[in-house]
Amino acid sequence: MTSLDDSVLTKKNIALLDNATNYIRPAIDYFHFKFNYDSLDVSTTWRLLLKMRKHKLLRLPSCSSENEFDYSIYMARLYHCIWRRWSIKHFNLDEYKIDPLSINWNKEIDVTVLYGPDLVGIHEREQPTPTDFPMGNIKEQGKQLLDVRKEGSASSLLKKGSVFYSKGKWLSQRSISFDDTVRRRDIDKRGRFRESCVLINDVEQFQNYSIVWDESRHRYRRQALPDTYDYEHLYPNGDETPRNTPHDNIIIHQNLHSITEGSYIYIK
């Protein structure tokens, strides 16, 4: 039974899959390769060549499947070559063969070899040996991870034998800091834009800081306010709703009730 379905695990399908995926498998010379006639290697190769010559599924060593004419001619040559070798072996015609160079038809410029895919057996692919991997380092790292799991802390990773300690230097990570404010630019329909500063972190109950522009870092940052700062100017009526006063300076004093998460601080 033959099938083109790659899910059917037959000897022919495995040979076709190995031909398409195993790039380290060498090609063979169909003129001189020693086929095993007892194990039906020739008949198996012949049937595969006959079946696959219309589907262009085989990967040929010196022919591209994109050129349909060259591919069909190459497959026909392989097919007829293997058929002639089987006929010579089956009818015992070895002694009747003639040397092609002895015939006067300008044979010296003809091809004396014909390479094709090896469809006889499945060659084992090269697998990396266990010596290629640093097993000692893997075992040490696994032991350190087990120590951390047992102790419940990362104290074992801070030793000099740890993977984070290399050549007398600690492999420390660079600290990451996040700003509490981000800049935003709004553009209206007429093309006018206005830059604003958006507060993204207002967890504290009362904001004892101001937002200032840092020239060295080229971004806004928070600056702590003195303890004697008077917030009464924000509540002239005694209620909790602050008045809407323009901010003429770059230093903006704000209260938690006047800025909520996602609100804007407009700066002229």
UniProtKB/Swiss-Prot annotation:
InterPro entries found in the cross-reference section: Glucose_repression_reg
Coiled coil: none
GO cellular component: cytoplasm; nucleus; vacuole
GO biological process: cellular response to glucose starvation; protein catabolic process in the vacuole
Superkingdom assignment: Eukaryota
Family: To yeast YKR075c.
Additional remark text: Present with 2010 molecules/cell in log phase SD medium.
Protein name: Uncharacterized protein YOR062C
Native organism: Saccharomyces cerevisiae (strain ATCC 204508 / S288c)
